[in-house]
């Protein structure tokens, strides 16, 4: 049974998966919108929503917690100065996932993940 199994494995080991999610999170923060597979988009949403909620505190502890996941200082700066202030009044639901069809090579379902304005 699959009870209480919250995160997807994405066909990778744990270090590869955490690197993938960190890189996708950095791309989403810098570009505000990315296209990826639907499953990866759902996993990135879990990661990025937690990071934005932490970043809304905007103190040293929050910066250190975000730096554990996002090792990019420029992306961290964008998160704290541009993205998190927009969502101070919002409790979750900072991103939107829109299905865009299937990839030509392997018919993987694609989706666009973006920040809600």
Task: Set out the residue ranges of the language-model regions.
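Ribosome large-subunit tunnel/peptidyl-transferase-proximal elements
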Residues: 1-91, 106-117
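Short, solvent-exposed loop/turn elements at beta->coil junctions and helix N-caps
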Residues: 98-103
